[in-house]
Curated annotation (Swiss-Prot):
Protein name (Swiss-Prot/TrEMBL): Circadian locomoter output cycles protein kaput
Upregulation: In the SCN, nuclear expression is lowest between CT7 and CT13. Cytoplasmic expression is highest at these times. In liver, peak levels from CT21 to CT3. Expression of both phosphorylated and unphosphorylated forms of BMAL1 with other circadian clock proteins occurs between CT15 and CT18. Expression in the heart oscillates in a circadian manner.
Biased composition (Polar residues): 447-463, 846-855
Key word Chaperone present: no
Ranges for domain bHLH: 34-84
Region (Interaction with NR3C1): 371-854
Site (Important for interaction with BMAL1): 84
Length: 855
């Protein structure tokens, strides 16, 4: 029993130990599992992070679009870092040391300043003489565009006598096969030599001129420039020729002019269409300059105000500018030619100006000239000048297309200064901050004073080929332009032959389709201008026709009116006391000056020709404007005869009298005595006997007719004043007067001439002497004083002075007979067969009576 108890105790102890062991094992397993889980999590996190980094690194590697494994990504990353390290080392070696330049200048600005100071440009040449790069500064020094030199041989720009020497210098390194080591390229390959280079010209026909230059540079292997820093340079080399090209070297040099330049010329434009505005006086002095001008020309506004614009122009451009300014003064606006403007930094820049004249808003007088100046490049100037000369200008794209040719392995068109600097183990790149420095860095064209360094060639050297058809087209275009300007009426059909002729012209060999289309566009523009001018001329013609129609309507209204004249009879002769002018049924008695225009029949048609034109004209007197002229005057009606005077048809007219006839009341100082008859063949008697200060002209004559004309408003266009000196008969220009001939008195010239011939010469001389002794101050003398004298005829006229040169007076007739012949009944019954119709005079133009101002 005791044993049983002890056994039970022992079994319980064993069971307790087994359970504790099992529990311990379970605890240990749980701990290991937890550690394993955490370790797996951390490992997975690390792997995920590593994969993310590898993926990000692979995405940054260039040139491969396919998915790469981790080892490839790591390998390419190592290669990239290695090349980057090499590039950094090269950049550090080529970096300009800080003690060479001021700290405030960048490498680009310092490089441009050095080029300006050296009067040079960069040039990269292959060993066979092919030019692969040239800087833009060559334009201001040698007047060549970079596109003219790239892909060309250097020997084309060197005199023939220097070809062998230059070729020997460039090919020297080829004799040493082991000299192309990096050490040799860095230290022992500097080369310097002098030669002559051809200077460019606008006209290829001009004689060639060479400038003496100095080359200073080094041979550089193209493999020394890393692919990552080529900046597109590698793309210009075709892949099939790249291995052979990479084994070659080039000569990168700074080309300097032997003769320094004092006045620079900036030929390139960094930003197109740079412009500024200014205002000038009519004497072309600066009145205003806007804020955009100082960065371009260097002058502040106060520095140029008051100075003449011609002080800043190149002497060779003054003549063309003067012509442009004359055109501006004639037409009020225009565009100047290309010209050079001197900046404050003593540099020439090319400008073109659009200008117009502004006028005062009140008095319409020109105030000043507004100018908009645009900066242009030398390439544009040269292209325009060559177009004027009829020379084909090669397009810039053609030079760039040459680099696409697969048959040439060394035609490389580099486009920036950075590439040449990289070949020279330099890597500066132009920055936006160096814009002002670039403008001041371009050097000028060689001064003509440096002629000792120039070698002119024989003028028999054949010039560059140009297109004669293009030149002819340009000349034809200019001739069409001159015809369109000078012609007064141009039809639209004029432009059709020109367009068809231009379309039928054969395209010469070498002329591109683009150039031919540009010429057709110019011809189309000329055609549009001609059509526009034609439309303007047609509009002017229509307007003039409308004005002519209105004038004809006024003439018809004037011809529809009548004129009635009342003659007052006196004892010794005829005293015309009043003149009544009627229009329809109304009689206007207001005193109004009458403007008329007419012509004088030549004296040789009536007389022998001994009387000059000046003697035929009646001296005019000034009619003073007084208040009495505004008052109305009644028309005197007495023993008068109403006469209707016939008209004259057109005849030969000479010696026009440019004045206006005004019939007024008699005055003491306005007497003109005109003889009623004059001898035709008498050369001894003087026509004008007296001419006193009271403006009286007295003609010696026997029988005279005293007339008194009173001013009355006339609605017609002309009044014919009696004048026995010229014709011998009163004539008017109204066709309606012919309807009153049944009641009118018509006198013939033949009767007057017969009466003059029948009169003895002695009696005529006595009458002339007696008329010279008579001094009658007015026609208001009593009739009793004239009983003992033969009847005299006086004509008193007053004419208004005014500035219309077209107004003329016809003095064509007089009244030679006495008062007994004037009654209409007596004339109609006894003298019907003696009436004679004289030609009708027609005046050139009529003055509107409404526009006549009282004097």
């Amino acid at each position: 029993m005791v044993f049983t108890v002890s056994c039970s105790k022992m079994s319980s102890i064993v069971d307790r130990d087994d359970s504790s062991i099992f529990d311990g094992l379970v605890e240990e397993d749980d701990k290991d599992k937890a550690k394993r889980v955490s370790r797996n999590k951390s490992e997975k996190k690390r792997r995920d992070q590593f994969n993310v980094l590898i993926k990000e690194l692979g995405s940054m590697l260039p040139g491969n679009a396919r998915k790469m494994d981790k080892s490839t990504v790591l390998q390419k990353s190592i290669d990239f870092l290695r090349k980057h390290k090499e590039t950094t080392a090269q950049s550090d070696a080529s970096e300009i040391r800080q003690d060479w330049k001021p700290t405030f200048l960048s490498n680009e600005e310092f490089t441009q300043l050095m080029l300006e100071a050296l009067d040079g440009f960069f040039l990269a040449i292959m060993t066979d003489g092919s030019i692969i790069y040239v800087s833009e500064s060559v334009t201001s020094l040698l007047e060549h565009l970079p596109s003219d030199l790239v892909d060309q041989s250097i020997f084309n720009f060197i005199p023939e006598g220097e070809h062998s020497e230059v070729y020997k210098i460039l090919s020297t390194h080829l004799l040493e096969s082991d000299s192309l080591t990096p050490e040799y390229l860095k230290s022992k390959n500097q080369l310097e030599f002098c030669c002559h280079m051809l200077r460019g010209t606008i006209d290829p026909k001009e004689p060639s001129t060479y400038e003496y230059v100095r080359f200073i540079g080094n041979f550089k292997s193209l493999t020394s420039v890393s692919t990552s820093t080529h900046n597109g340079f590698e793309g210009t080399i075709q892949r099939t020729h790249r291995p052979s090209y990479e084994d070659r070297v080039c000569f990168v040099a700074t080309v300097r002019l032997a003769t320094p330049q004092f006045i620079k010329e900036m030929c390139t434009v960094e930003e197109p269409n740079e412009e500024f505005t200014s205002r000038h006086s009519l004497e072309w002095k600066f009145l205003f300059l806007d804020h955009r001008a100082p960065p371009i020309i260097g002058y502040l506004p106060f520095e140029v105000l008051g100075t003449s614009g011609y002080d800043y122009y190149h002497v060779d451009d003054l003549e063309n500018l003067a012509k442009c300014h004359e055109h501006l003064m004639q037409y009020g606006k225009g565009k100047s030619c290309y010209y050079r403007f001197l900046t404050k930094g003593q540099q020439w820049i090319w400008l073109q100006t659009h200008y117009y004249i502004t006028y005062h808003q009140w008095n319409s007088r020109p105030e000043f000239i507004v100018c908009t100046h645009t900066v242009v490049s030398y390439a544009e100037v040269r292209a325009e000048r060559r177009r004027e000369l009829g020379i084909e200008e090669s397009l810039p794209e053609t030079a760039a297309d040459k680099s696409q040719d697969s048959g040439s392995d060394n035609r490389i068109n580099t486009v920036s200064l950075k590439e040449a600097l990289e070949r020279f183990d330099h890597s500066p790149t132009p920055s936006a901050s160096s814009r002002s420095s670039r403008k001041s860095s371009h050097t000028a064209v060689s001064d003509p004073s440096s002629t000792p360094t120039k070698i002119p060639t024989d003028t028999s050297t054949p010039p560059r080929q140009h297109l004669p058809a293009h030149e002819k087209m340009t000349q034809r275009r200019s001739s069409f332009s001159s015809q369109s300007i000078n012609s007064q009426s141009v039809g639209p059909s004029l432009t059709q032959p020109a367009m068809s002729q231009a379309a039928n012209l054969p395209i010469p060999q070498g002329m591109s389709q683009f150039q031919f289309s540009a010429q057709l566009g110019a011809m189309q523009h000329l055609k549009d201008q001609l059509e526009q001018r034609t439309r303007m001329i047609e509009a002017n013609i229509h307007r003039q026709q409308e004005e002519l129609r209105k004038i004809q309507e006024q003439l018809q209204m004037v011809h529809g009116q009548g004129l009635q004249m009342f003659l007052q009879q006196s004892n010794p002769g005829l005293n015309f006391g009043s003149v009544q002018l009627s229009s329809g049924n109304s009689n206007i008695q207001q005193l109004t000056p009458v403007n008329m225009q007419g012509q004088v029949v030549p004296a040789n048609q009536v007389q022998s020709g001994h009387i000059s034109t000046g003697q035929h004209m009646i001296q005019q007197q000034t009619l003073q404007s007084t208040s009495t002229q505004q008052s109305q005057q009644s028309v005197m009606s007495g023993h008068s005869q109403q006469t209707s005077l016939p008209s004259q048809t057109p005849s030969t007219l000479t010696a026009p009298l440019y004045n206006t006839m005004v019939i007024s009341q008699p005055a003491a100082g306005s007497m003109v005595q005109i003889p009623s008859s004059m001898p035709q063949n008498s050369t001894q008697s003087a026509t004008v006997t007296t001419f006193t200060q009271d403006r009286q002209i007295r003609f010696s004559q026997g029988q005279q007719l005293v007339t008194k004309l009173v001013t009355a408003p006339v609605a017609c266009g002309a009044v014919m004043v009696p004048s026995t000196m010229l014709m011998g008969q009163v004539v008017t220009a109204y066709p309606t007067f012919a309807t009153q001939q049944q009641q009118a008195q018509t006198l013939s010239v033949t009767q007057q001439q017969q009466q003059q011939q029948q009169q003895p010469p002695q009696q005529q001389q006595q009458q002339q002497q007696s008329s010279q002794e008579q001094q009658l101050p007015s026609v208001q003398q009593p009739a009793q004083a004239q009983l003992g004298q033969p009847p005299q005829q006086f004509l008193q006229t007053s004419r208004l002075l005014h500035g219309n040169p077209s107004t003329q007076l016809i003095l064509s007739a007089a009244f030679p007979l006495q008062q007994s012949t004037f009654p209409p009944s007596h004339h109609q019954q006894h003298q019907p067969q003696q009436q004679q119709q004289l030609p009708r005079h027609r005046t050139d133009s009529l003055t509107d009576p409404s526009k006549v101002q009282p004097q």
